[in-house]
From Swiss-Prot:
Source organism of this protein record: Oryza sativa subsp. japonica (Rice)
Record protein name field: Probable histone acetyltransferase HAC-like 1
Keyword Nucleotide-binding attached: no
Residues that coordinate or bind acetyl-CoA: L1217, D1218, S1219, R1236, T1237, W1292
Catalytic reaction list: L-lysyl-[protein] + acetyl-CoA = N(6)-acetyl-L-lysyl-[protein] + CoA + H(+)
Protein's job: Acetyltransferase enzyme. Acetylates histones, giving a specific tag for transcriptional activation.
EC number: 2.3.1.48
Biological process according to GO: positive regulation of transcription by RNA polymerase II
GO cellular component: histone acetyltransferase complex; nucleus; transcription regulator complex
Pfam family, any one: zf-TAZ
């Protein structure tokens, strides 16, 4: 529980202000003992993270400061404990956050000295107190004195109390959840009761651990409070059992001394610092709240706090014990049952030994707190939050009796040792060993210990008592141990004798029984902050139980038992990391018959309906207002689980949380309940359904509808909650998860019945031994089978037919186990139970999407869980939310994480993780499923012949055929392979040679291989031995992947099933085929997931550009549809239209284009830029086809803004555009063009309009169709889509541009050749290559570089007087004839380059389209962006800029416009307006590794076989592309571990499951570090190993190509690094070379494109010549 809540509840839930009457001035309810992540909590589940950070920082400072002083191993091992403990002292001193901050700002040393001094004093006092037992035991006179009015009474004359003030600073976790002063309010009779000021028995070790407090207890017990005066008693409390035992472990020693003159001190470890902040709680009265006896008896005798004969005990105030009673037996050994009562007075407490010792064990909520009806009574103490204790006077002659008798419930007094409930804990392995060692030290000693709380002081019959307390071995060996309360309750709100409220047994069957209760952590959580134990070997805190003979029952090996294997969930405010408390019942437990009656139903209804009332509204947010109409109001809910040990405030808070959780579950049930109205077994289900319908639509904050505001509050919190420790949300999720997990554990050969329709499934509620009711409706569990990997079609595994027995533990609930367990009835008689089971986890109507934030952790479940730990597993969070399938009748509200996702997983009935969205078909309706299956069998996209062939195969299906498409074997298109030297594509089935691995693999066509006459071949500067070459044939085929349905076990293609292998969880995810899915939907067993369950195109981030294009597109489509409707004389609804379109920008990144070196050399004197910055963008169009968003269109653009240098300033380059022919509907517009074409044109026009508005002046388009068999963006086009010729493609662009011209978006159209290579009309611009816009991937930059190299080679050959290998070089005479006057130096090279380039471009000049968005000057050809434009009205398309106009005015009239004419035309100025001064992009950067370049996206598609050649594949590929877009950090490819050669599954965090130490990301970070590290003794992990690999790489002769394993490993990491590295000056070895290699690959692609264009032009010229 948190600080804020502790103080709040302690006051408000008792009807009083929070009490701060505690020792040392410490505030109420500190949270310093909680785990760090649970400290300083304010509000409902909210964390004061700032305060938490401050405290953690202070701990670190203390740790560092002390660590510098000491360096021994033993000291450093204990240092974290000491640092935490010292910080807790400081926290006690500075409770306020502001004070704490001021303290932190100062030096740490003075504060540390104070903390150390306080801690030393506490340890010293602890040692002194160990010598006190005889003194205290002998001082009996004081206890009979009546305190004098007005005089504060002290328990002893000892002046040790000054330590009390200082030693309060170290409470244990949860310690501060109770007011540490016992004065919690005035008594009802007006008396001021005694106040027992107890120093928090936290971690101080200053509290007496032996007899001191015990003697005081007895004395105080006999004191009579004087009316009107405060009798205060300052008594230190033993810290060793502050974790929940709450009694003095020295007490049994005292008793033993008095009887046998023997003393066994309970704490010998004061020399060391123990129990640092890990205890559950420390307020002694809170200890008593949770227990009725020191060792777990529900109604055991509590005498003087520790078995002191004649001493009476008054229970403390329990402000939150609304569902829990403390069962107190009579004093002495009287077998009479305790009469119990409740009244409705505010609670208060009389100082009794309880206040000091808290001698009862802690029970979780409801364990000792047996539920009862309104009128149930309890002797002398009224613990519920709405009752007050009547002031009572007890002496050692009086038994406890009721002051206001009420109808009673007689409780069975368990005064025999064999009926005691001993509390144990789940132990970590280390703690078990240490505790066993401690136990072995004391097994040979007489153990009189804490069981004496149930004995008489004198133990007249020790032997018989010992024999009675011996645990039967069969009881110890039971995997399900019980600690039930054998109390029979009345029918009002109570369970019948066959269904007792008890705690689930611990999972540890063979743990020795230790004294009281102490804390531990769950085995799998022991790394988190929790209970810190001292050296158990030196402490005698842990003793065996009751007798000498019981020693033989203690096992020598404490082992963790996984028989229960239950998931325990966490309640905030309980033990750190929710230490599970288990109660052992040392009785023989046998199976008892259980009748199939409606008792469980009644209990569930009581759980969910009964809302306890409070006179103080602040006590329960869900008190009276949360009662459902007609629900019975009782003083205690009948089935609340036991509160973990935490005291009054903790008990109150957990009830507070628990009720919220139960209400939340009830809302879930009502929301998903499918039963007819009035027939649901929850008779108030209909009213809650009405409430749900109301508050889901209600927007009023002050709505007066019953429970509306509170219901909305809890559901909204659930939606937004990302706290894995939230006591409400996390528990609700885990309950539902556990419900499905329990269902999945049952694998009977036939459907079995677990109960009638009214039976409830009990689910573990987090603290071991606690249960909570979750309703499961009857249904069938199908036979399940071991999980089969989904990727490969393997031999089927037969389902398990092993019959499972259902165990009935002592819980009234039905916890499914594989073993029998015993259920004691009310008379402690036993019977045997064996029953068939049947579970119907009904599906959700609306599955929950729970977002946990990025890289966060979420609970999941799996099968292989380490023994002893709960099945709470942490899984790496992906970035896409997958809704949870609870497989129960509960449903969860839909929560959408606006950031990236996390993955919520539950366990399905088959035992596999049920991951939502593993198949897109889960979102389909049955009609959409049928539409999808019909579409599969049409083979849309294939040629008519292939489609008919596949359809024919479908008519002849066999058992190996896909159940959906009816075809057996389908293969992917093999990725294209290119020859490394020549760049030619290696044809299908052609032979080739290969060498190398990974990205360094090279391919050689047969001609290139044969041309090399030597023994080696040089490629990219590397020589490869021919002997190492491997000859292959390009005929490899990859078959489509398969997936098997977990229901019907039929096989389908993953593509047909729209199965996402990335969510397959390593082959463990459950998959339901479409056929079974439809059947389940028709039977009402499940509902289709909402469309938001799997993130789609609409969930991609929107940008200004995408919105602009979409707005224009939708407006134009609406107008087009209206025109068609008008033409056909129909309404607009009667004509089909394009629907489901989404435009998104998926990549928008800044890049730099480096100018090629040869070209730069020519213009270096002209200050030509070395690089051009630009922004690269990728735009995609999606359309929802048959329920799936299919990517139909994509384009890449380059934007060179105003900041870019000339000649690229304000220019845009449309670099690539691609589409596939699946657009729907396939109709034509009014103008006769295809609607598909209309849409694509509007996207381009919208983009040009957007560019013009931003201030760009021109757009450049190279209308170049792809090569046959190659793709630009989308991989593998359908056969029905023809690749256009260049003229068709050019006309396609020009028709679009003509539309844009009509809208005045485009002002001029020209081509690259006419604009730059010749001077036409009055153009006065210089013809030079420096004016050409320089774009990445364009035709001319690459061609110019090749030409420069060729010109240089020719020049070298001419100098050597050799004939040129190509045609003769252009002479200067020819250049002069062409008009070039300056032929000196680089100018001649420029002229020759332009001449040669012009000759190449001229035949295809129309393909290089120049689009002017602004007017260009007719003289200088500059695009005008400011000033005035001078226009000639007589001449068409003549405009000049201000600069040229000024120059024009300096000329003579005959030289002015128009030139070569006698006429003079007047120029009119036109202002250039509406053009922004810059081209700043308002959109944010959008990075996508997969869309960074079109080659990167192609590589993604090729490597994963994301093909678009058929509609079925296009749908699957688009689904996967969207998955990658929404999960950018998920690995793109399945990577192979270089150590074990196993695949590293995607989504596994780049980890190899076989090699646990291999983490790829860490290795890449290490690579960067090692490349710059110069330290010979670097401590960075594995730094020297990587350096050794570097040295090996320089010396190795074998190399990676030769098979060297070390070289392969290094190359693999270097390649991965180079892909992601953006640093041009990176120091990682070979990084630049690898980048250059990648650049060459892109250059090869560009070269192939140019070569194909040149070949096409050559063929065209040949055709023209032939026709002539």
């Amino acid at each position: 529980m948190n600080v804020g809540q502790a103080a709040h509840l302690s006051g408000q839930m008792s009807g009083q202000a929070p009490q701060t009457n505690q020792v040392g001035g410490s505030g109420v309810g500190g949270a310093d003992g909680l785990p760090q992540q649970m400290q300083d909590v304010v509000g409902l589940g909210g964390l004061d993270t700032q305060f938490l950070l401050m405290r953690n920082t202070m701990r670190d400072r203390i740790f560092e400061y002390i660590g510098r002083k000491q360096s021994s191993t033993d000291w450093r091992r204990r240092l974290p404990e000491l640092a935490k403990r010292l910080e807790e002292i400081l926290y006690r001193k500075f409770l306020n956050k502001a004070d704490y901050l001021n303290m932190m700002r100062g030096p740490v040393e003075p504060q540390l000295q104070f903390a150390i001094k306080t801690l030393s004093a506490q340890n010293q006092q602890n040692q002194q107190n160990q010598q006190m037992p005889r003194q205290m035991a002998s001082s009996s006179g004081y206890g009979t004195m009546i305190p004098t009015p007005g005089i504060t009474q002290s328990a002893t004359g000892n002046s040790r109390m000054p330590y009390v003030t200082d030693n309060t600073g170290l409470p244990s976790s949860g310690a501060t959840m109770v007011p540490q002063g016992a004065n919690t309010g005035s008594m009802s009779n007006g008396y001021q009761h005694l106040t027992t000021s107890v120093p928090l028995n936290s971690t101080t070790s200053s509290i007496p651990s032996t007899m001191g407090p015990v003697g005081i207890q007895r004395q105080v017990t006999h004191m009579i409070p004087t009316p009107g005066f405060n009798n205060q008693q300052n008594v230190p409390v033993n810290p060793d059992f502050s974790n929940g035992a709450g009694y003095f472990n020295g007490e049994p020693t005292v008793t033993s001394q008095m009887q046998q003159q023997k003393q066994f001190p309970s704490n010998q470890n004061s020399h060391q610092i123990q129990h640092i902040g890990g205890h559950s709680n420390s307020g002694m009265h809170s200890n008593m709240l949770e227990n009725s006896s020191a060792y777990g008896l529900s109604d055991g005798h509590v005498n003087g706090g520790m078995g002191v004969h004649g001493s009476n005990m008054q229970l403390t105030n329990r402000s939150a014990a609304s569902e829990a009673y403390i069962n107190i037996s009579t004093y002495g050994n009287s077998p009479k049952p305790v009469q119990q009562q409740f009244n409705q007075h505010p609670p208060q407490r009389i100082p009794t030994p309880v206040d000091i010792s808290g001698s009862g064990n802690f029970y979780n909520t409801g364990s000792s707190a047996l539920t009862a009806a309104n009128n149930h009574s309890m002797g002398a103490t009224n613990l519920p939050s709405r009752s007050r204790m009547n002031s009572m006077l007890h002496t050692n002659q009086l038994n406890m009796q009721s002051i206001q008798p009420q109808p009673q419930i007689k409780t069975e007094v368990l005064d025999q040792p064999e009926k005691m409930n001993f509390q144990s804990s789940q132990l970590t392995h280390e703690q078990l060993i240490r505790q066993q060692h401690s136990m072995q030290q004391h097994q040979m000693q007489p153990s009189s210990q804490f069981v004496q709380n149930q004995y008489h002081l004198n133990q007249q019959q020790p032997n018989s008592q010992h024999q009675q307390s011996i645990l039967r071995s069969n009881s110890l060996k039971q995997p399900q141990l019980s600690s039930s309360h054998s109390m029979q309750l009345s029918e009002q709100g109570a369970l019948p004798h066959t269904e007792l409220i008890s705690s689930q047994a611990t999972e540890h069957a063979d743990i020795p029984i230790y004294q009281g209760q102490y804390q531990q952590r769950s085995a799998h959580d022991n790394v988190k902050g929790g209970q810190v134990f001292g050296h158990l070997s030196s402490s005698q805190n842990f003793h065996s139980n009751a007798s000498h003979d019981s020693q033989q029952l203690l096992p020598t090996n404490q082992q963790l038992d996984d028989s229960s294997n239950d998931v325990s969930y966490v309640l905030k405010g309980s033990q750190p990391e929710q230490m599970h408390q288990a109660q052992w019942r040392p009785q023989t437990m046998e199976k008892a018959p259980v009748t199939n009656d409606s008792s469980l139903e009644k209990q569930i209804q009581a759980d969910l309906c009964q809302r306890t009332m409070s006179q103080d509204g602040a006590q329960q947010p869900f008190s009276s207002d949360w009662r459902l109409p007609g629900c019975t109001v009782t003083p205690a809910d009948p089935a609340l689980p036991k509160l973990p040990s935490g005291g009054l405030e903790q008990a109150a808070g957990n009830i507070y949380y628990f009720r919220q959780m139960k209400w939340l579950l009830l809302l879930f049930h009502a929301k998903s309940c499918l039963t007819p109205v009035g027939s649901c077994k929850f008779h108030r289900c209909f009213q809650v359904q009405e409430l749900v319908k109301h508050f889901e639509n209600c927007k009023r904050k002050d709505c007066s509808y019953r429970d509306c505001r509170r219901s909305r509050m809890v559901t909204e919190h659930y939606k937004a909650c990302v706290d894995l420790q939230c006591p409400v949300c996390s528990n609700a999720k885990k309950l539902l998860q556990r419900s499905a997990e329990l269902a999945s554990k049952q694998k009977p050969p036939e459907p079995r019945k677990i109960a009638q329709q009214n039976t409830a499934q009990r689910i573990m509620n987090g603290v071991e031994g606690d249960i909570m009711d979750i309703d499961l409706v009857s249904d069938e569990i199908f036979d399940s089978q071991p999980s089969v990997p989904k990727r490969l079609k393997m031999q089927p595994v037969s389902p398990s037919t092993a019959e499972r027995e259902v165990s009935m533990p002592s819980n009234a609930g039905l916890i499914l186990q594989e073993t029998h367990s015993e259920l004691p009835d009310q008379n402690n008689k036993v019977g045997q139970l064996k029953m068939d089971v049947k579970i119907d986890p009904r599906p959700l109507q609306k599955p929950a999407k729970i977002g946990y934030g990025t890289d966060g952790n979420v609970p999941t479940a799996r099968h292989n869980v380490a023994p002893g730990g709960s099945n709470e597993i942490k899984t790496h969070v992906k970035q896409e939310i997958m809704p949870i399938d609870k497989e129960t009748s509960e449903t969860a509200p839909e929560v959408k994480n606006e950031a990236n996702d996390s993955t919520d997983i539950t366990v399905s009935k088959s035992g596999k993780p049920k991951i939502k969205g593993v198949s897109m078909t889960e979102l389909f309706t049955p009609e959409q499923i049928q539409e999808h299956i019909n579409s599969l069998r049409l083979w849309v996209g294939q040629s008519k012949a292939k489609a008919e062939k596949n359809q024919l195969m479908g008519h002849n299906e066999n058992e190996n055929s896909c159940q959906l498409c009816k075809v057996e074997k389908l293969t992917f298109e093999p990725p294209p392979i290119y020859c490394s030297p020549c760049g030619a594509r290696i044809k299908r089935n052609a032979p080739y040679y290969t060498v190398g691995t990974g990205d360094t693999r090279h391919f050689f066509c047969i001609p290139c291989y044969n041309e090399s006459r030597g023994d080696t071949i040089e490629v990219e500067g590397q020589n490869f031995l021919k002997a190492r070459f491997e000859k292959k044939r390009n005929d490899e085929e990859t078959e489509e992947w398969w997936v098997q349905c977990d229901k019907c076990e039929c096989w389908q293609h993953q593509i047909c099933a729209l199965f996402n292998g990335r969510r397959n969880d390593g082959g463990q995810a459950e998959y339901t085929c479409p056929n079974c899915y439809v059947e389940e939907v028709k039977r009402g067993l499940r509902m289709p997931l909402p469309q938001s369950a799997v993130l789609g195109a609409k969930d991609l981030p929107r940008t200004v550009l995408s919105d602009h294009i979409e707005d224009r597109l939708f407006k134009r489509l609406k107008q087009e549809r209206q025109d068609r409707a008008a033409q056909e004389r129909k309404s607009i609804e009667e004509v089909p239209g394009a629907e489901g379109l989404v435009v998104r920008v998926v990549s928008s990144v800044d890049k730099k284009l480096e100018v090629k070196p040869r070209f730069l050399e020519i213009f270096q004197e002209d200050n030509y830029p070395t690089e051009f910055p630009y922004k690269s963008k990728a735009v995609l169009l999606f359309q929802k086809i048959e329920g799936v968003e299919v990517c139909l269109f994509g384009m890449y653009v380059q934007e060179f803004g105003a900041e870019c240098s000339y000649p690229n300033q304000r220019r845009v380059y449309l670099s690539y555009l691609d589409s596939v022919k699946y657009f729907r509907p396939e109709i034509r517009t009014v103008s006769g063009e295809a609607l598909r074409t209309f849409v694509y044109h509007e996207i381009l026009i919208g983009y040009l309009e957007y560019c013009k508005q931003r201030g760009f002046t021109s757009c450049y388009i190279w209308a170049c169709p792809p090569l046959k068999g190659e793709d630009y963006i989308l991989y593998c086009h359908p056969e029905i889509q023809k690749t256009p010729k260049s003229d068709k493609l050019r006309e396609w662009y020009l028709s679009m541009l003509r539309k844009a011209t009509k809208e005045e978006i485009v002002v001029e159209l020209t081509n690259l050749y006419d604009h730059f290579f010749i001077t036409m009309g009055e153009c006065k611009a210089k013809v030079t290559a420096s004016r050409l816009p320089y774009f990445d991937g364009d035709y001319w930059p690459g061609a110019a570089e090749d030409m420069i190299n060729q010109l240089r080679q020719e020049e070298d050959d001419r100098k050597q007087q050799k004939k040129g290998k190509t045609k003769k070089i252009i002479t200067k005479r020819a250049l002069k004839a062409a008009g070039h006057t300056d032929l000196s130096g680089n100018a001649s090279k420029d002229a020759m380059l332009m001449h040669k380039l012009g000759e190449t471009i001229y035949p295809m000049k129309e393909d290089f389209i120049m689009v002017h968005l602004q007017y260009s000057c007719s003289h200088c050809c500059t695009l005008m962006v400011s000033g005035k434009r001078w226009v000639c009205h007589q001449c068409r398309s003549f405009y000049i800029c201000d600069k040229c106009y000024d120059a024009e005015q300096q000329l003579e009239d005959r030289e002015r416009h128009p030139s070569n004419s006698r006429d003079t035309h007047t120029l009119h100025p036109v202002d250039i307006v509406g053009l922004p001064k810059d081209t700043k992009d308002r959109d944010d950067i959008l990075e996508s590794e997969f869309f960074d370049t079109r080659q990167a996206f192609l590589s993604l598609c090729q490597g994963n076989h994301y093909q678009y050649d058929t509609l079925r594949r296009a749908k699957h590929s688009s689904m996967m592309v969207l998955y990658h877009l929404h999960n950018p950090t998920a690995p793109a490819f399945v990577t192979t571990c270089n150590v074990c050669c196993h695949d590293i599954e995607t989504g596994q965090g780049w980890r190899c499951e076989v090699c646990p130490d291999f983490d790829l990301r860490k290795m890449l970070d290490l690579l960067v570090h090692a490349s710059t590290c110069r330290s010979g003794s670097c401590q960075y992990p594995n730094c020297r190993k990587v350096k050794g690999l570097f040295r090996h790489g320089m010396q190795c002769k074998t190399r990676a190509s030769g098979g060297c394993v070390l070289c392969k490993k290094m190359w693999y990491m270097l390649q991965l690094h180079a892909r992601a590295c953006r640093d041009s000056g990176c120091n990682v070895p070979r990084c630049r070379d690898l980048k250059e290699h990648l650049r060459r690959l892109q250059q090869q692609s560009d070269s192939r494109r140019r070569a194909a264009v040149n070949e096409m032009m050559r063929q065209r010229a040949a055709e023209v010549a032939a026709n002539e």
